[in-house]
C-alpha cells in the first residue's frame, strides 16, 4: 500500500521523519486562474495538493493547468490531488477535465473527490473510509465495481463521532481528540465492529444513551488491509490526525 501523508508546510518537517511520500497541502487557486502557494520548503517529490478554499471563478482553465504542470515539473511531483470539499461548481469542470488530460500526457496521476468522478477519465477517485453505517467491505466492493481498484484511493480519516440514541437521521457530532480522550478516561467497555471496522462504546448523558464510533491505529490498519485484498493500493492520511499513532500504523 502506497501511503501519502497530507501535510501543511508547517507540519512537513515532523511528517517527513516518517515518509518522503507527502501530499503538500500548500496550494490553492487565486484570482485570474493563478496557482497560489504557501511558503514551502525546497522539497522534491510527493504530490501537489490544491484546496478549494475561497476559490474565485476559474476563468482560464488552460492557464491554471499550465501553472500546475510547471510546478509539478519544478518540484518533481508525481501527481496532483484536488482536495475539493465544497459542492462542485460548473467552472471547475473544464479545469478538472483539462488537468486530467494534461497530467495523463506526462504520466502523472490526478487524484480527485468522488464528486468529480467521470469528469477526468483515468483519474483516481478518493473515497472516505469514515463510514458510520453498513459494511465497510461492501462499501469498498461497490466502489471497486464502479471505478475499478486501480482508480481508487482511500482518504483514511480517523473517525471520532458521537451519536445520540435513537438517531433517526444518522447525523453524528464530530469529537475532537481531547473530547474522545475525556470520554475514554471514564473506562467504558469498548467493542470492535467487524462490519464498520472501527471501535465503539456507549455511555449515558442526560437520560439518553450516546454511541461513540472511533478509529485507532488497529482499525485504520485493518481498513487498509481490507482495501488491499480488493486491489486498492493507495491511501491518504491527514498528518495532524495520525501524528500521535504514526509509530503504531507504520508506513
Predicted segments with their positions:
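Chitinase-like catalytic core of GlcNAc-active glycosidases
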Residues: 1-135
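Conserved, mostly hydrophobic/aromatic
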Residues: 22, 82, 152-154, 227
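A general structural detector for well-ordered alpha-helical segments in enzyme core domains, enriched
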Residues: 64-71, 95-99, 139-143, 171, ...
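A structural motif corresponding to the C-terminal end of an alpha-helix
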Residues: 74-77, 102-110, 143-151, 222-234
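Short catalytic/ligand-binding loop motif for oxyanion handling, primarily in non-cytosolic enzymes
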Residues: 89, 119-120, 161-165, 243-246
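Short acidic, glycine/proline-enriched helix-loop-strand junctions
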Residues: 92, 99-108, 192-200, 204, ...
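Glycan-binding loop/region signatures in secreted carbohydrate-active enzymes
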Residues: 151, 155-223
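Acidic/aromatic/glycine-rich contiguous surface patches that form carbohydrate-binding/processing clefts
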Residues: 223-251
Amino acid at each position: 500500500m502506497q501511503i501519502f501523508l497530507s501535510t501543511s508546510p508547517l507540519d512537513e518537517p515532523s511528517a517527513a521523519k516518517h515518509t518522503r511520500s507527502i501530499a503538500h497541502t500548500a496550494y490553492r487557486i487565486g484570482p485570474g486562474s493563478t496557482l497560489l502557494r504557501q511558503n514551502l520548503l525546497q522539497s522534491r517529490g510527493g504530490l501537489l495538493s490544491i484546496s478549494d478554499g475561497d476559490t474565485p471563478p476559474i476563468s482560464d482553465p488552460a492557464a491554471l493547468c499550465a501553472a500546475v504542470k510547471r510546478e509539478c515539473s519544478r518540484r518533481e511531483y508525481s501527481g496532483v490531488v484536488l482536495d475539493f470539499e465544497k459542492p462542485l461548481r460548473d467552472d471547475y469542470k473544464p479545469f478538472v477535465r483539462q488537468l486530467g488530460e494534461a497530467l495523463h500526457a506526462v504520466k502523472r496521476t490526478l487524484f480527485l473527490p468522488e464528486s468529480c468522478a467521470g469528469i477526468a477519465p483515468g483519474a483516481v477517485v478518493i473515497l472516505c473510509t469514515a463510514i458510520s453505517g453498513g459494511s465497510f467491505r461492501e462499501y469498498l466492493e461497490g466502489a471497486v465495481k464502479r471505478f475499478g481498484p486501480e482508480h481508487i484511493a482511500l482518504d483514511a480519516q480517523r473517525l471520532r463521532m458521537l451519536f445520540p440514541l435513537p438517531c433517526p437521521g444518522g447525523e453524528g457530532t464530530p469529537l475532537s481528540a481531547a473530547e474522545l480522550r475525556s470520554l475514554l478516561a471514564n473506562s467504558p467497555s469498548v467493542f470492535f465492529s467487524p462490519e464498520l471496522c472501527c471501535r465503539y462504546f456507549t455511555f449515558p448523558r442526560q437520560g439518553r444513551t450516546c454511541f461513540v464510533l472511533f478509529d485507532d491505529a488497529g482499525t485504520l490498519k485493518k481498513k487498509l488491509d481490507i482495501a488491499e485484498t480488493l486491489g486498492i493500493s493507495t491511501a491518504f492520511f491527514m498528518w495532524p490526525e495520525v501524528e500521535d499513532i504514526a509509530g503504531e500504523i507504520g508506513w
